[in-house]
Amino acid sequence: MVDASIIIGIHGLANKPPPDEKPTWWRQALIEGLRRNCGKTTDLLSFDFLYWADLRYPAPVSDNDNTQPYWSDQGVDPFPAYRSHKWTEIINVAEKIIGTELDFVELHTGISRINDYVLERELTDLGAYYDDDGFRTTVRKRLRDKLLEHRDRRIMLIGHSMGSIIAYDVLRMLGREEPQFRVDHFITIGSPLGLPHVKFKISQENDLVRTPSIVGRWTNFADRRDIVAVDAKLSDDYEPNDQGIKVNDVPVINAYRSPANKKPPNSPNYHKSYGYLRTPELSELVRAFA
């Protein structure tokens, strides 16, 4: 019997572990979040995954080269929630400063210095996505086919980092090509969708920079310390769709740290997908959906 609901993930920028390993780790991170944050012990999570790193890299990341793999945290308490975190006030102030700079520079020059740094230094795959027609067409088709494969089910689509851009673009395409198709919940984590250059690219293909028409709900999760999600408030940038669906921005604490047996040990990564996937705020949505 096929489950009525399914969660579909799409990974972000840079090379990844093998295609049979990466989705397993995403699924385990979601399940760990349910167990730690919601007290729900289950392995029965209907999950599918769109892997695209092979389109950019000749071989996946090996175990020896992967310094920040998924690993199950040894604690038993819930992961830290944003509302109770000791750094909340400091992070809020930092967000206001960064957001003000982004908006001011974009308003008066059309570009952002922070945006340029992120695109040039951190998001080389994104440059290829916009410059390489073959890559862009192929990765979009992969996700489009994956979504349509599950068209008779309730779908939660989770896009991390650059994967959130690919997901957004495909959802806008499907809105034009398959207007009856539905994605119940679109979730973006560590997303660069707020960058001015990304919004400009969206505006070149679409009438408005807005919520995709086929989406019933859109939630954006961002750790304020995540440089890729430097503009964390997408609700300021994306108009609602015709049904009035607007993106809901939810700040979170990405508590991921690298394992003790990797160098550097116990190193934080505020952009890491596994940290986002086991935040209490995301776990609550997964629990209610699944």
PLM feature segments, named:
Residues 1-53, 57-63, 101-158, 162-290:
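Lipid deacylating catalytic domains
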Residues 44-91:
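N-terminal accessory alpha/beta regions
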Residues 84-108:
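Contiguous, non-catalytic segments that form substrate-binding/exosite surfaces or channel walls
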